[in-house]
Every structure is written in structure tokens, then in C-alpha cells.
Amino acid sequence: MAIVSSKSPDPAERRSQAKTKPSVSEPQDSLVRPQAAPEESQRPEDQIRPQRLADYIGQPELKDVLGIAIAAAKSRQESLDHLLLYGPPGLGKTTMALVLATEMGVQCRITTAPALERPRDIVGLLVNLQPGDVLFIDEIHRLPKVTEEILYPAMEDFRLDITIGKGQSARTPSITLHPFTLVGATTQIGALTSPLRDRFGLVQRLRFYEVEALTDIVQRTARLLNTPLDQAGAEEIAKRSRGTPRIANRLLRRVRDYAAVKAPGPITGAIAATALELYNVDPCGLDWTDRRLLSHLIENFGGGPVGLETLAAATGEDAQTVEEVYEPYLLQIGYLQRTPPGRVATPAAWRHLGYEPPQASGQLTLQQLLTEPET
């Protein structure tokens, strides 16, 4: 299976893309953010990616569904149905697209939606696909409208409708395409338009990983990187990885660096814990910014409730960054609650930071939290 990436546009495209700002200002120095770090995007990850469905760890329901789809497509000698993968970043959507291509014995063409801002960008990709090839579009919710409309007939009828000319002299010739499989990946499925979403025959969600599955992933990566690691060391890294394989592999690399300099030999649980404390990743996977947000909420606002804008101003972050970068994991592990009157730190968050939770009598009742308007 060959992997072809279209993430390196021509100079004109690079200049155009440089003008596009990301929707959220995200910290780039944190080890526990699920977004790919720049060096992870640039460095080939083929050596640690699983190549076959049987080697893909975790996501058992997804593997069962896709295993059936692959077997059925092979038996009919057809291409796979179009697939939409959604879920938080770092859970293996790109890896799954590559696995599908390997299982089907075809090429995988990789691109991102922001790179397809002009019609010729997507047309060039589609006309060069061979029968059965996989076209993977990351961040598909960010497709420009004109590009999305070109995809409609391509996905349904394997046909390109190109308008040439304007006004009464305009004509729309059709170009027949080879059958292909479009795999779209998104972290915001609600941002997709209904016409695009409805054209996917398979829509599957990737879920956060359990510690056991992450431990297996860490051990597998360590073997591929020739890094001696015991069970306790793998578990220590896994439990601080926020349920995300990308973070687990990133933490393993940092622990490997620490061990090479400070503690040569197999990485034990104690070594992994010491290394990750050095990098400000605590046993629950919280980093300094997560703890600062909770500390502000507890120390300055008595644990809440407090409105999003107020909390963002107190922490020096913009509201969108707080809502989309910091809060999801805090909500996932039960350290933060979103209520109509605002954000509330849970008793578990108080105890994790070493504070004594206030007595229930001093708290707003659940009914009050559900009915009071947010300030």
C-alpha cells in the first residue's frame, strides 16, 4: 500500500494558506494536547502506525464494523463505501484510513480540507485516483462550499461536473471517475452540512481509550522504538495520556529522553512518574494550564458557578480556547461541570488540587444550578 500525501502545496497555495488563521488559539508547548505537534506532522510516523486491522489496538466496535465492510467489498470486488470518522483529535482517524487502504490493497491519498480551497485542488486529486483508491480528507468540516459541491456527484456517481464558460455559453461536461472510497475525518460532526454527511455510507465515532488499551499501545510503540519498558512504566504513561494514543506516544518519547539521560536501563513506573512530573503532567493527565484554570475557579470564585467569559478573563485566555481546548478533558474526567449559571468545579477537582470541598449546605442546589441563568 502506497501513501501519497497532498499536504505540501505549491508556493502559491502555501502563501494562501498562511493567511488562514486557526479557529482556536492553542498552546503549543503542552505535552497533553491531542492536536498533532509540528514535529509530529513533519516526521513520518509509519514505523509506529499499525498496518493491518488486526494490529489496530482499541476501538473494538469500529473494527468489527469495518472488518465486515472490508470483507463484503472484497467479495463483491467493489470499493469500500464512503466512510466518515468523527471524534476527538488524536484517536487514530488517519491511521484507520491507512489501515483500510492496506487491507484493500490500494493507495491512500491524504489531504486536509483547508488545502482544497480552489476547485482545481480537489479536481486534480479525484482525476488521478486509481480504481478502489482511498482519499482521506482531514478536518472535512472545513471544506469550502465550492469544493464540497464538486464532491457531491463524485461521491454518488463517480462523476465530475465541471462548468466551463459563463452565461448562455456555459457548458457542463462530465468526467467519469474511477470508483474510490472517500474517508472523511472531523472533530466537529455537527459542523458538516447535511448533504455532505448524508453521502457517507458509514458514519463511525472513535471513542477515548481505556487505560488497558493505551498500555498495550505504549508497549507496542516501545518495542518498535527499541525502548526497554516494563508493565508498570507503560501503565504510568497510559494513565496520564487522557485516553488518547497520540498523547501516549508523545509522553513515551519524552520519558525515553529522560531515561536515556537520567536513568539508563528499562523504564519503570517510578522513572516514568518522575519524568512526567518534570514535564508537569500529573497522575490524572492534567498539565499546568489545566490546574491553573481549576485553581482560579476555586480560589477566586469559590468553585463557581462562574460564566465562561469571566473565567476566561481571569485566566488570561480567550473564551473559545477555554471552551474548546481546556474544558473537554476536565468535563470528561468529572472535574468540571457546565451549568446554566456557569462553570462549577466538582468536589473531585477540589480534592485533586489539595483543597477541602465546601459542605453541601454551602453549595447551590442542583435545581438552582439548572434554573439560574448564566452570568
Swiss-Prot record:
Annotated source species: Synechococcus sp. (strain ATCC 27144 / PCC 6301 / SAUG 1402/1) (Anacystis nidulans)
GO biological process terms on file: DNA recombination; DNA repair
Basic and acidic residues bias locations: 40-49
Any one GO cellular component localisation term in the record: Holliday junction resolvase complex
Protein name from the UniProt record: Holliday junction branch migration complex subunit RuvB
GO molecular function (one): four-way junction DNA binding
Gene name of the record: ruvB
Record keywords: ATP-binding, Cytoplasm, DNA damage, DNA recombination, DNA repair, DNA-binding, Hydrolase, Nucleotide-binding
Residues reported to bind Mg(2+): T94
Catalytic activity: ATP + H2O = ADP + phosphate + H(+)
InterPro entries: AAA+_ATPase, AAA_lid_4, DNA_helicase_Holl-junc_RuvB, P-loop_NTPase, RuvB-like_N, RuvB_C, WH-like_DNA-bd_sf, WH_DNA-bd_sf
